[in-house]
Amino acid sequence: MSERKYFGTDGIRGKVGESPITPDFVLKLGFAAGKVLARHGSKQIIIGKDTRISGYMLESALEAGLAAAGLSAAFTGPMPTPAVAYLTRTFRAEAGIVISASHNPFDDNGIKFFSTEGTKLPDDVEAAIEAEMEKPITCVESAALGRASRIVDAAGRYIEFCKGTFPSQLSLNGLKIVVDCANGATYHIAPNVLRELGATVISIGVQPDGMNINKECGATDLRLLQERVLAEKADVGLAYDGDGDRIMMVDHLGHKVDGDQILYLIAREGLRQGELRGGVVGTLMSNMGLELALKQLGIPFARAKVGDRYVLEKLKEKGWRLGAENSGHVILLDKTTTGDGIVAGLQVLTAMVRNHMSLHDLCSGMKLLPQILVNVRFSGSSDPLEDARVKAVTAEAEIELKGRGRVLLRKSGTEPLIRVMVEGEDEALVSTLANRIADAVKAV
């Protein structure tokens, strides 16, 4: 298949007001998507968004395009990405559309699609939408125009779904939990889920104003959560990103618990309960400590390319059910069709309650190796990954690690960045090597 013009690894994303995230582009995208998706039968599309101020503008443009193509839009209002996937399935809709730029700042936004099964759209459907966008908009006859409606109980439906992934014989009674919703799409969902399961909940990041999403809070900035967990003497802290498809956690000592550790805890509990089917999938960025800890448990481990869509592809290829990225995207195919921060967190809380153990103690079976990640912004036509000097410095670093570490260079799928990752047993050496390689990349 030829390279896609607009769709990246996670839909279409960019700065609001700049191509492609403009009202006219999104209207045309809605029409093109409507024309392609209408061929499959259903006439309804679910549309959700996070809390960015630009969401109002973009959902209106999408609705106009879809209506012109003869499809009706059902709006959820602010809703986590995995909730839109769930509602798309339960409503038997033709597709779901999420307006979000996930963990990015408020002045970015994006559009991503879910199939009727609640999974990412196949590449060939995205390609068909791009091809349709090259054609002019030709509105259907007036009698065939789409309508717009609102799903008034969308939040309640998803809250009950999330609670259903927590064992009915258990409760969170006695647990004090601080939850950081990043002023994003989980702000009216996650605290209620935890409270209704019995926890004492302290909520932060639950006052979205359209411009404070992900700002010094949420899964990408844990400082506020760590401070609050310690101040409140809470048992655990949970942090989601702006659209709720990823999670980070904090133990009662204020220590960060990342996606690799969360994956380990869920896999180990699944093994103990006889529920784990096959192995688990991580990514090229997953810490070696995860691989070693799973090996000790006899759990097979496979690495996918970075990106939740690639984790999902590897799970399907292997016939396995559990995978995650260290950034906190956790996919539990026995419960969901896509990464779901709230559901993933509930599985860790299940392990805490069932084993009467703190999050800190549960994590003691896995030792993370020191890992340094340096992001280097690049521009221009030259490819730093093909540069002879960068290759030479990388090869030298691998020799210095003596087989007891890893070096990984890769391009970001969503930003003009080269990510330089080095891990190994010696933190000082790892830091030195990562910065040396980053300097070589900057010099290109």
Swiss-Prot record:
Mg(2+) binds at S102, D241, D243, D245. This is Phosphoglucosamine mutase. Catalyzes the conversion of glucosamine-6-phosphate to glucosamine-1-phosphate. InterPro entries: A-D-PHexomutase_a/b/a-I (IPR005844), A-D-PHexomutase_a/b/a-I/II/III (IPR016055), A-D-PHexomutase_a/b/a-II (IPR005845), A-D-PHexomutase_a/b/a-III (IPR005846), A-D-PHexomutase_C (IPR005843), A-D-PHexomutase_C_sf (IPR036900), A-D-PHexomutase_CS (IPR016066), Alpha-D-phosphohexomutase_SF (IPR005841). Belongs to the phosphohexose mutase family. GO terms for molecular function: magnesium ion binding; phosphoglucosamine mutase activity; phosphomannomutase activity. Its EC number is 5.4.2.10. The keyword Metal-binding applies. It comes from Erwinia tasmaniensis (strain DSM 17950 / CFBP 7177 / CIP 109463 / NCPPB 4357 / Et1/99). Gene3D superfamilies: Alpha-D-Glucose-1,6-Bisphosphate, subunit A, domain 3, Alpha-D-phosphohexomutase, C-terminal domain. Its cofactor is Mg(2+). It is an enzyme of class 5 (isomerase). Activated by phosphorylation. CDD domains: GlmM (cd05802). It comes from the Bacteria. It catalyses: alpha-D-glucosamine 1-phosphate = D-glucosamine 6-phosphate. The modification Phosphoserine is found at S102. The keyword Phosphoprotein applies. Keywords: Isomerase, Magnesium, Metal-binding, Phosphoprotein. It holds the Pfam family PGM_PMM_I.
